[in-house]
């Protein structure tokens, strides 16, 4: 069963215009039983390494990093993405890479939404190549979208791209989506623990929650097999301080990521020997269970950690 908009256990078709109509509907709290069973059934299946290598080679990923990703997918068989599509995402202080010529690129200014869209589309396409399921939840828009099941000839991925073309608008109801993700993970937690696996939850946002206490919403994740990535889409001090305060309230390991350029500057300050490119940034956004990748922007790696990072790359 595909998940091109899920409602009452049935596959529901939407067009780009229906994204707007769904802006104020109730957040879906439960998966249909059939979808949950289908997802659990993928957890022991190996990722499609051949398709992944072909896709990532076109994006100039080194072989070592591709192997690291494929191996890690056996430990993390599913990913969740909570995507902030609030009105502030149209502010033009984002950054994205424009590629030109042979293996050349430059950083250019764009909206926060354009920066995030580029990332989300890549990760969704990566999910399709790997056949590793990912669920995308927009704060104000479409029903949850699951890609990477390989059962709908790319229909879910096409819908995902259509949704990301919409103009962001609305508030920042993070808590509702976090609560829904908590419930979804709880429903598959037994299967994950049995397989010694985890899932990742990436929250991509540029602001503060408009519908409650985010720390309270995130707290149940401390008892679930999950890794959390916070992808900040702004460097505004009030927002950074807000999320730092939440991090301090929780016994939850949160990997905080900025845009690629700012991450590269931070990493250069601690580990100047490392070239931080797009491939490594996308891998960290996708979410991996590699501790060294969590700390490269926070501290200088010791000799053993450096050896491991070189192995992963």
Residue ranges of predicted features:
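Intrinsically disordered cytoplasmic terminal tails of membrane proteins
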Residues: 1-40, 312
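Acidic, polar low-complexity linker/tail segments
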Residues: 19, 26-105
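Surface-exposed acidic, glycine-flexible loop patches that form ligand/cofactor-binding
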Residues: 68-73, 125-130, 183-195, 219-220
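Von Willebrand factor
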Residues: 72-198, 200-204, 209-212, 233-241
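Intrinsically disordered, low-complexity regions enriched in proline, serine, glycine
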Residues: 90-92, 128-137, 147-149, 190-195, ...
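VWA/integrin I-like adhesion module and closely mimicked acidic/polar interface patches used
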Residues: 93, 166-172, 207-250, 257
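Von Willebrand factor A/integrin I-like adhesion domains
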Residues: 161, 218, 235-290
